[in-house]
Amino acid sequence: MKNQNTPIAFEGFPFIAGFAALTLLTALSAGKLCSAILYGFSALFALLTLFSLYFFRNPQRTPPADERAVVAPADGTVIVVDRVPVTPLGHEALKISIFMSVFNVHVNRVPFSGRVVELTHTPGKFFDVRDSRSSCENERSTIVLETVSGLRMAFVQVAGLIARRIVCYARNGEMLERGKRYGLIRFGSRLDVYLPPDVQPLVKLGDKTIAGETVLGRLG
């Protein structure tokens, strides 16, 4: 799996470079032509460059010392905490869903250490990720992970109305480490986490999460 330690996720480099080049080009052209319109475009591209730097930021995070703690895979707001019968695990599980707005960090992190036993990408629709249909009908990337103790959990990157580009660095059979970066979704999206049904949730609806740090629950 790619190990990104750069302060900006490399998926953002084409956007940043492109907008920065357009900023410079329009500024130089505006100076030569004395064009207020081109100056306006230059200012717009400069703002888009700054927004891209902000959107693709990739801050360092430190997981809690408790090795039983399952951490949030994304920055955002908890929109689902429920035990559901239909899951990627094939049985009832505790489901915790996190909504990422366009203003959240969009780098995704591994909730718990373990081995990838199943990795699937499912084409689908692009409902708003706050719509309950998005979990089972939207395009998504699903990882089923098995811990060293044999417990299984799943975490799902869900594409949304605007976010239509899922990036997942993980590979089948790979060992993942809790808190490490494993993917990204562009421009607003959702992460679903499925835990064993006996896990007690440590977050509630409306709570804000920090990827790699906020504890969602603890495995027994």
Swiss-Prot record:
Q: What is its EC number?
A: 4.1.1.65
Q: Which UniProt keywords apply?
A: Cell membrane, Decarboxylase, Lipid biosynthesis, Lipid metabolism, Lyase, Membrane, Phospholipid biosynthesis, Phospholipid metabolism, Pyruvate, Zymogen
Native organism: Pelobacter propionicus (strain DSM 2379 / NBRC 103807 / OttBd1)
Cofactor detail note: Binds 1 pyruvoyl group covalently per subunit.
Query: What's the protein here called?
Result: Phosphatidylserine decarboxylase proenzyme
Q: Which family does it belong to?
A: Belongs to the phosphatidylserine decarboxylase family. PSD-A subfamily.
What's its job? Catalyzes the formation of phosphatidylethanolamine (PtdEtn) from phosphatidylserine (PtdSer).
Q: Which cofactor does it need?
A: pyruvate
The pathway this protein participates in, as annotated, is: Phospholipid metabolism; phosphatidylethanolamine biosynthesis; phosphatidylethanolamine from CDP-diacylglycerol: step 2/2
Biological process GO annotation list? phosphatidylethanolamine biosynthetic process
The molecular function terms of the Gene Ontology recorded here are:
phosphatidylserine decarboxylase activity
Q: Which cysteines are joined by disulfide bonds?
A: none
Q: Which HAMAP family match?
A: PS_decarb_PSD_A
Cellular compartments per GO CC:
plasma membrane
Pfam families (UniProt xref): PS_Dcarbxylase (PF02666)
Task: List the catalytic residues.
Answer: S189 (schiff-base intermediate with substrate)
How is it modified post-translationally?
Is synthesized initially as an inactive proenzyme. Formation of the active enzyme involves a self-maturation process in which the active site pyruvoyl group is generated from an internal serine residue via an autocatalytic post-translational modification. Two non-identical subunits are generated from the proenzyme in this reaction, and the pyruvate is formed at the N-terminus of the alpha chain, which is derived from the carboxyl end of the proenzyme.
Instruction: Quote the subunit structure annotation.
Output: Heterodimer of a large membrane-associated beta subunit and a small pyruvoyl-containing alpha subunit.
Q: What does the UniProt entry say about where the protein is found?
A: Cell membrane
Task: Describe its membrane topology.
Answer: Peripheral membrane protein
State the InterPro entries in the record. Answer: PS_Dcarbxylase (IPR003817), PSD-A (IPR033175)
